[in-house]
Amino acid sequence: MFFSRLTSQSTATFSKQIAKLRAALDASDAVIIGAGAGLSTAAGYAYAGERFEKLFGDFAARYGFTDMYSGGFYPYDSLEEYWAFWSRYIKCNRYDPIPKPTYGQLLGLLRDRDYFVLTTNVDHCFQRAGFDKKRLFYTQGDYDLFQCSKPCCQETWDNEELVHYMAAAQEDLRIPSALVPRCPHCGSPLTMNLRADDTFVQDKGWYAAADRYQDFLRRHNNMRILFLELGVGSNTPVIIKYPFWQMTAKNERATYACVNFGEAVAPAEIADRSILIDADAERVLDALAVQAVR
């Protein structure tokens, strides 16, 4: 399905848009959350600026990059340096406490509701906040998983224990060589299970989650579904945004809601069943919580 043009947020006030979203949430038979990087940004995960300087100022001084994202792609001279960066990166963005209660607020809105989460985020925040693992599909990987860099197999490995060891043992921005993780099958270096190219490993857990998502869609076909998109930008629209638009267009009982600061749009074809809120997720979730107690 092709859409002719996009429409931006309505002229309704923020409070009226929140009331519409609250009503759509309460009237829905099921809620499908589409979560992008903006949701984790709202939860306090800043990858540049003050937080970056506090956590990675020493790396910035030596290597010259100015944000965590760039540090992840830096061509380090050794695996010891590479894993010094990545172990600290994983620790602070996966294993340290979530800075703000944003994900917990979202879970509170979904309690006793039939929901599923589709996300491109890889920081494990949904599970850490208490979401049911069987209602989650992380399409792009997870910070807490390693995979073979070749890859020689379609397996992944939990990394929590080793990440903490590496983060604690590093000196002069290097980890001890003995801690460099290697594939137990072929001996190649392990790498992060994050989608970057065609070497990304989709393990049994990935396929099981994909099947559960498709089953959820089948079971709720033509029901009153709220497709609630939170912080989804335009980097990978084929995963969440375009499918949400298409499914809303096909199901006349569905509502599409887009919460995204500076980028709240929908096709004109579904404008009458769209709720577009140009604000960050933290502000919207706070407002929905207030609506709930009135």
Regions found by a protein language model. Give the residues of each.
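Conserved catalytic alpha/beta core of Sir2/sirtuin-type deacylases, generalized to analogous enzyme cores
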Residues: M1-R294
